[in-house]
């Protein structure tokens, strides 16, 4: 049971609701790209992102404390035609009836997509460009066969990154990041191909930062508008706090635990609008959030109970995000999973134990709301407190499948063997599903997933699928003819 009526109500809506396709982001992205033909790709993408931040509806749902949504629905499944649109066109007429991960999509939305979105992207999507570069027989194996799962890697973005809250995002905020990029842009002369590319990058950073800051401003304005007409004084106070939080973050460094929670969600939401990437990991949440928690509790601004409610609200936000995938991908990755791996516990950079009050709150929030996100991981070391081990065991005993338990020393050793410094290796977090990872580096842990069982099947069945009879493998002879 959730810690409050608020989070329990949101949890029930999450559990019993079916995600709905939103065409808004795709429509904005398409119109922006029509307007920026001929400009550098990073700049075009940044302008499309900024347009989405400025035009998508700023919706605050009843009772919310953490705000921000990628479409007009609480669980919006957005489309990414610049990555891939052909599978959506083939499958969207049966989205609501497929057995795994169905989506609601109206006839009007389908007609709009086919008339106003797909025509522009025909021949321009990442999918089409990628498949054209491959031999035909190879390309055929990569799409919806269950033999080589490659299509899930380019129908939506694969993130496999951990935002650096400790050293970049929280200390600077997006305004300072923007100003630094603008300074680099001004200092970089357009006198070489390399510098022209650098200028495009810096320009795109400026535009993207302006976009995410404007998105937050719009939520602040909407919260203020709702507060002005709110009759309930308690809810009015909450809306005013939301307005203040969104006026502050993510443009500026957070000052309170609530601001830090909202900052984290704006980072996730920005990535959703940009690429909808899976495996965008919140990282070592209990480490970078604890200073705000401790300061607020000491100052009397926050109670552990209120902190738990805020974390539950954030967990629900993580779970409302929808990874829009094909029916074939859903057969293997069912559950609307985004693989947002959040890690608690483990050693600090100096080698001391990092378990704190927030580590326990994260466990309790996961047990309370019972959401599928974030993917909660715990790091267990030889000096882990017994109380934390018992709390982890209690959560495991509920049968939820959380948390994933990882050997702290093994994770650090893997990064040491990869060449990381000891302090960085000790600061590892889990990435996606699942690999030890450090927040200052990106990863690409799998360009394709190989079904070795299918390889054996084709070898023993003359290169043909036992499901369809289609010859997809090498034309091997019958097994009884093997020497």
Regions found by a protein language model. Give the residues of each.
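A conserved hydrophobic secondary-structure block that centers on an alpha-helix together
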Residues: 226-234
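Solvent-exposed, amphipathic alpha-helical segments
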Residues: 222-226, 292-295
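Conserved catalytic cores of very large enzyme subunits
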Residues: 2-205, 234-241, 245-483
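Extended non-globular scaffold/tether segments
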Residues: 203-214
